[in-house]
C-alpha cells in the first residue's frame, strides 16, 4: 500500500510540474510559487507535500518549450539575448551581467531581461539612463545572498526595444558573490557581454 501511494504521489508531482510549466509558458508567470499554486488549484490538489520543486518545474518548462513552438521559442530567445547584449554594451561602465531565464534559456515570450549592475550608487546608473534618454523607474528587489541572508538592493526598470529590462544594482564588490538562484538555491549564473555575445553569435 505505501508503495502504491508513493507512486501516486510521484505521478501527481509530475502532473503538477507539467501544469505549472504550461502556466509559466503560456501566461507569462515567472514566479515559481505562484505557478505551483495555480497548478495545484487547477488540478484540485491540496497536499503541499506533493508540490514539485522549482528545479522540477524548470525541467518541465524546458520540455514544454522543446515540444511546443520550439522554433518560435528559439527566435524569441535570440531576440531577447540580442537586446540584452545591446543594453549591456550601453551600460558597460557598470560591468553588467545577464542573469535569469534569458541566460539559462527558459525565457518565455513574456520574460523580462534581468541584469546585475555594479556601482557605488544606483543614482549613477539613473544618471546614465537619463543622459541617453531612457525613461526608467526605481524599485527595490529582495535578493537571497546565502542560506541565511536576504538583502534589499536598488533596481531600475526600463524599456529596451520593446522588452522590459530589470537591472539590480549591487555594490562594486558584489561582483565577487553571486546571489542564490530561486530555481536551485545555488549561486546564480552570471554572464558578461562577451559570453552573451557568444550565445547570440555576434561580435
List the predicted regions and their residue ranges.
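Catalytic core of pol beta-like nucleotidyltransferases
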Residues: 2-29, 36-109, 120-203
Amino acid at each position: 500500500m505505501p508503495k502504491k501511494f508513493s507512486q501516486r504521489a510521484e505521478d501527481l508531482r509530475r502532473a503538477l510540474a507539467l501544469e505549472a510549466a504550461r502556466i509559466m509558458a503560456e501566461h507569462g508567470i515567472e514566479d515559481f510559487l505562484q505557478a505551483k499554486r495555480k497548478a495545484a488549484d487547477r488540478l484540485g490538489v491540496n497536499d503541499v507535500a506533493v508540490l514539485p520543486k522549482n528545479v522540477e518545474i524548470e525541467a518541465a518548462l524546458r520540455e514544454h518549450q522543446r515540444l511546443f513552438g520550439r522554433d518560435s521559442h528559439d527566435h524569441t530567445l535570440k531576440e531577447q539575448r540580442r537586446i540584452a547584449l545591446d543594453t549591456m554594451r550601453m551600460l558597460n561602465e557598470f560591468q553588467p551581467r545577464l542573469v535569469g531565464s534569458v541566460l539559462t534559456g527558459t525565457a518565455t515570450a513574456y520574460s523580462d531581461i534581468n541584469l546585475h549592475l555594479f556601482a557605488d550608487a544606483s543614482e549613477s546608473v539613473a544618471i546614465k539612463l537619463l543622459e541617453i534618454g531612457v525613461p526608467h523607474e526605481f524599485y527595490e528587489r529582495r535578493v537571497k545572498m546565502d542560506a541565511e541572508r536576504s538583502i534589499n538592493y536598488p533596481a531600475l526598470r526600463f524599456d529596451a526595444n520593446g522588452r522590459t529590462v530589470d537591472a539590480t544594482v549591487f555594490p562594486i564588490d558584489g561582483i565577487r558573490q553571486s546571489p542564490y538562484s530561486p530555481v536551485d538555491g545555488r549561486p546564480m549564473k552570471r554572464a558578461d557581454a562577451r559570453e552573451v555575445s557568444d550565445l547570440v553569435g555576434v561580435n
